[in-house]
């Protein structure tokens, strides 16, 4: 609270800078049911922690950064068989819904009826192709709801995100995800007899 309060005053420039840094962090608490929800027509530039504004952010990216949104669609088509397009559509009652077009069907499916893995992969791609990357991105167990074959490519996406200047912290229990991680990128926690935990880098382990 002190950082947030003092950071609003111009004379505390260092605190204000620190405040902006923290406010730019993204600690994911992604929830499938939240991401399935529709949104009132509005405006959102960045994906929320739970993903409940996924439709609004998709609409924003499509309208303001069409090239990036096209990259997301191309990645989706590569990783989710049958996905032809995704669009955020406004309904007659002023709601924004995501519609997924499968090439084998005439009519698109709204987000409520697509698989958990399809929705989660789309949300991750929207997050990772954000035109304004977060300085710190924290993801817990990205393997949940995703097919193991997708994890290596997802790991590469996280690595590319980090190479653009941000930091990425990921906790995982998936050997498939770990297989795509370089040794110098991998750490684990060891519990010590004194009750504390020790962080060990895989490349330093004999």
Regions found by a protein language model. Name each.
Residues 1, 97-101, 186-187:
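Short polybasic amphipathic segments
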Residues 1-74:
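Electropositive, glycine-dotted interaction segments
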Residues 57, 106-110, 197:
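Short small-residue beta-strand/loop micro-motif enriched in glycine and branched aliphatics
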Residues 74-129, 136-149:
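Conserved ABC ATPase signature
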Residues 128-131, 161:
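Hydrophobic helix-cap positions at the C-terminus of alpha-helices
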Residues 153-206:
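C-terminal lobe/lid and adjacent interdomain/linker elements of RecA-like ASCE P-loop ATPase modules
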């Amino acid at each position: 609270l002190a950082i947030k309060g003092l950071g609003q005053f111009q004379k505390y420039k260092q605190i204000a800078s620190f405040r902006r840094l923290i406010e730019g962090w993204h600690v994911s608490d992604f929830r499938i049911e939240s991401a399935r929800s529709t949104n009132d027509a509005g405006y959102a530039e960045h994906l929320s922690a739970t993903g409940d504004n996924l439709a609004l952010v998709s609409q924003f990216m499509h309208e303001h950064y069409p090239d990036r949104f096209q990259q997301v669609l191309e990645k989706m088509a590569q990783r989710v068989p049958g996905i032809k397009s995704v669009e955020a559509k406004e309904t007659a009652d002023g709601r924004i819904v995501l519609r997924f077009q499968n090439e084998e069907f005439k009519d698109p499916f709204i987000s409520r009826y697509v698989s958990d893995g399809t929705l989660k992969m789309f949300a991750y791609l929207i997050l990772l192709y954000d035109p304004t990357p977060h300085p710190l991105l924290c993801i817990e167990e990205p393997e949940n709801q995703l097919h193991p074959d997708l994890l290596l490519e997802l790991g590469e996406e996280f690595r590319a995100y980090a190479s653009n200047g941000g930091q990425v912290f990921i906790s995982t229990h998936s050997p498939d995800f770990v297989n795509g991680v370089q040794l110098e990128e991998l750490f684990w926690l060891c519990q010590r007899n004194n009750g504390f935990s020790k962080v060990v880098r895989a490349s330093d382990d004999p």
